[in-house]
Design a protein with these regions (language model features):
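A short C-terminal boundary segment appended to hydrolase-like catalytic domains
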Residues: 119-148
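Extracellular glycoside hydrolase catalytic/binding regions
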Residues: 1-100, 104-130
Length: 148
C-alpha cells in the first residue's frame, strides 16, 4: 500500500501497475487492482480459463495487459490465446524470443540436467540461427499483429 501511496504523491508520467500473478493472494490482488492505472496479469492457462480471467478483470474498467502467457505444455499457445487477446484488445507480452538468451525453452520446474533439447519448448519462438521453432506460430503472430 505504501508504495502506491508514495507513487501517487509524485504522480509519475507512466501508468502505475502491479502485476497479478497468483489468484490465491486475494488481499494483495484487491490492493493491486484498486491502485493500478492499468491492470497487468500473468496467465499460463488454456483459452477457457484465460477468457474467464479477462472477463473478471473487465469490471475494473481499465486497460489490460497480459504480461506473461504462452506455455505450450499448459495449452497456453499462440494459436489459442493470441486470438482471444486480440479480440479483447488486451496487450500481450510473452517470455522468450530466441532460444539461449533466457533459456525459457525449458520449463521452470522440469530441469534437464544434461541440457538436451526438451521434447516441447516451454517458451521461445526462434532457434539461435533465426529459424522458427514452429513456422505456423510465427505466421499467426505476424497476421494478428499486422491486422487492425
Amino acid at each position: 500500500q505504501k508504495v502506491f501511496e508514495w507513487s501517487w504523491q509524485i504522480r509519475p508520467s507512466q501508468p502505475l501497475s502491479a502485476g497479478l500473478w497468483n489468484p490465491v493472494l486475494t488481499d494483495l490482488n484487491v490492493l493491486q487492482l484498486e491502485n493500478s492505472d492499468i491492470i497487468t496479469y500473468h496467465n499460463y492457462n488454456g483459452p477457457e480459463e484465460h477468457q474467464t480471467v479477462i472477463d473478471s478483470l473487465r469490471k475494473y474498467n481499465r486497460p489490460l495487459v497480459c504480461t506473461e502467457y504462452m506455455a505450450r505444455r499448459n495449452n497456453s499457445l499462440f494459436t489459442n490465446i493470441m486470438p482471444i487477446l486480440k479480440k479483447e484488445n488486451v496487450g500481450a507480452i510473452n517470455w522468450g524470443l530466441v532460444a539461449g538468451k533466457s533459456n525459457t525453452k525449458y520449463a521452470w520446474d522440469e530441469p534437464i540436467p544434461d541440457g538436451s533439447e526438451p521434447p516441447l519448448w516451454f517458451h521461445e519462438i526462434f532457434h539461435p540461427d533465426g529459424k522458427p521453432y514452429k513456422q505456423e506460430e510465427v505466421d499467426l503472430i505476424k497476421s494478428l499483429t499486422l491486422s487492425k
